[in-house]
Swiss-Prot record:
Residues 1-19 form the signal peptide. A lipid is attached at C20 (N-palmitoyl cysteine). This is Lysis protein for colicin E6. Keywords: Cell outer membrane, Lipoprotein, Membrane, Palmitate, Plasmid, Signal. InterPro entries: Lysis_col. GO terms for biological process: cytolysis. It comes from Escherichia coli. Pfam families: Lysis_col. It comes from the Bacteria. A lipid is attached at C20 (S-diacylglycerol cysteine). It is a lipid-anchor. It is found in: Cell outer membrane.
């Protein structure tokens, strides 16, 4: 049972990391200097 929950947690972590990275890449490609709501949620600080 513990092995199953571990696998589920690992999958969730990977999905969340991938989503955050996709948001960050999209913000960078957009070329906007102002921080977006996604950047604030993920804790990414823009200069």
């Amino acid at each position: 049972m513990k092995k199953i929950t571990g696998i589920i947690l690992l999958l969730l972590a990977v999905i969340i990391l991938a989503a955050c990275q996709a948001n960050y890449i999209r913000d960078v490609q957009g070329g906007t200097v102002s921080p977006s709501s996604t950047a604030e949620l993920t804790g990414v600080e823009t200069q």
